[in-house]
Amino acid sequence: MLDLSLQGKRAVVTGASLGIGEAVVKMLSDHGASVTFCARNKDAITNLTDYKSESPHSKIKGLIADMSEASSTENFIKETLEEGPIDILVNNVGASPSRNFLYMSDEDWRDLHELNLLSAVRCTRSFLPHMREQKWGRVIMISSSAGKYPSAALIDYGATKSAMISISKSLAKKYGRDGVLVNSVLPGLIHTAMWERAAGEIADASGGNAEEVIKKNGLSVPIGRYGTSEEVASLVTFLCSNSASYINGAAIELSLIHI
């Protein structure tokens, strides 16, 4: 029988202002986990902490943090651990600026690596020891299809997401026998604010409109449409559950853009 219950588990989700992160927080909570998440502004915190979970046992707590800054990330980790150890970590925070390689400075590269990659490294390094100690843990890296199929317009983004996949596989090999399962999720075209922004930029450059761009891009997916944040959250929830006890080191794409 499929067991998706997360009752009694404590989870952390980074970058949950909206989109995939928000959906993951809600779904983990609905399945019984108590979730701590971070966002950059108070409105996002309030919006999500007011969510009425389907589970009477779960709690949702939001903390303001800028995960592109080491000190802010460390403060988030410290405050989270003050309430006890973590069983589940979902490294979701990230940005995907579209820019020309020839005009990207060293600072541009460093800033995106701090946010997309080093935030995940810092959180994993801090929360993983307890998982090893108790012989049970889940670490999910929200990577991207760009980590496997790089885009000319998202060079630095793709590089950070490729690195997340590599780190995930290495950690899976290192800690799998300790009961800590580490996997990557590679969302493709998911209808989020990020893709709406990208569609708008394409539309402006081509003289079209964003809705037409989204529809056309959706046809490149075998299913014929963009995915939803909730569909990504469903996969994450499964990977965090006991029913995913033999999935380790996987890099799961959804949905395929390239076949």
Task: Go through the PLM ranges and name each one.
Residues R10, S17-L18:
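Conserved glycine-rich cofactor-binding loop
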Residues N100-F101, D108-H113, N217:
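Substrate-binding pocket helix/loop in short-chain dehydrogenase/reductase
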Residues T124, T160, S168:
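Active-site helix of classical SDR
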Residues P129, K173-K174, S245:
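Alpha-helical segment proximal to the catalytic Tyr-Lys
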Residues S144:
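Residue(s) in the substrate-gating loop at a strand-loop-helix junction
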Residues G176, L181, I247-G249:
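Short, small/polar-rich loop/turn modules that mediate ligand/substrate recognition or access, typified
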Residues I257-I259:
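Conserved small/polar residues in nucleotide/adenosyl-binding loops
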